Amino acid sequence: MPPLRETVRVHGLSASKALGQNFLFDEQLLDRIAAIPGDLDGATVFEVGPGPGGLTRALLRTGARVIAVERDERCLPLLADLAEAFPGQLTVIADDAMAVDVDALTGGDPYHIVANLPYNVGTALFTRWLEPAAWPPRWLSLTLMFQLEVAERIVAPVGTSAYGRLAVLAQWRARARIAMKVHRSAFTPPPKVMSAIVQLTPADQPPGVDPRILSRLTEKGFGQRRKMLRQSLKGIDGAVAAAEALGIDPTRRAETVSVAEWVALARALGR
């Protein structure tokens, strides 16, 4: 196939600011990203927002079976050409990733999620993938591109300025790491900020915890992060009393409460 940059030029395609698009053309960089999940030969990979298909090409070169969801109709002809070049490996679905059921699309098989997430929906998709009631999930790993600031919030330790709701939701039942930083100059057009690849793999879930309760607790707690817990959590019935019973001082602020403490509080409220 011709180089991706040439294919994009021939089709007269440009990145859409409205869709949060920034294209990657560096094949070596894309191959490095596709290698982060490990051996994908024969594996199923779900990709969000492939755009013109740069990362898709790299994933297909690993031997993976890729299911790609793209809402930008301008990109569909390029992806159709890619499907012809890799027969039987690529399925393209024209839809909004927020509207699809990944487990249903993958036929119940385990899968990896690899995506250069559009900046405008990345966090919403990420938290959705972290909140299924059943655990471990069907996904085996998440390899996701975020703005560096968001990536740092996902892996942040307790007590740091970056630590917040994203860190708790990511770390309470998954292992999270920054696998790679990507300079803004690697993109076309260059975004205003640096990016990073975050990789997550499922860990054992602490027993007796309802993810919906944990989600609500952290939403309240970190929604007013400068307030003491006795103020930020007072809208949740029994939360302050449960915190005191667990030895969590209600005069503390949310950013000082560890992942394990948030989990213990969610468990107590779920009884």
UniProtKB/Swiss-Prot annotation:
InterPro entries named among the record's database cross-references: KsgA/Erm, rRNA_Ade_diMease-like_C, rRNA_Ade_Mease_Trfase_CS, rRNA_Ade_methylase_Trfase_N, rRNA_adenine_dimethylase, SAM-dependent_MTases_sf
One GO CC annotation: cytosol
Molecular function GO labels: 16S rRNA (adenine(1518)-N(6)/adenine(1519)-N(6))-dimethyltransferase activity; RNA binding
Record's subcellular location: Cytoplasm
Location, primary (coarse class): cytoplasm
Catalytic reactions on record: adenosine(1518)/adenosine(1519) in 16S rRNA + 4 S-adenosyl-L-methionine = N(6)-dimethyladenosine(1518)/N(6)-dimethyladenosine(1519) in 16S rRNA + 4 S-adenosyl-L-homocysteine + 4 H(+)
Binding site for S-adenosyl-L-methionine: N22, L24, G49, E70, D96, N116
Pfam annotation, one family: RrnaAD
Entry keyword Methyltransferase: yes
EC number: 2.1.1.182
Designated gene of the protein: rsmA
Family statement: Belongs to the class I-like SAM-binding methyltransferase superfamily. rRNA adenine N(6)-methyltransferase family. RsmA subfamily.
Keywords (A to Z) from UniProt: Cytoplasm, Methyltransferase, RNA-binding, rRNA processing, S-adenosyl-L-methionine, Transferase
Gene3D superfamilies: Ribosomal RNA adenine dimethylase-like, domain 2, Vaccinia Virus protein VP39
Protein name from the UniProt record: Ribosomal RNA small subunit methyltransferase A
Database matches in NCBIfam families: ksgA
Described purpose of this protein according to its UniProt entry: Specifically dimethylates two adjacent adenosines (A1518 and A1519) in the loop of a conserved hairpin near the 3'-end of 16S rRNA in the 30S particle. May play a critical role in biogenesis of 30S subunits.
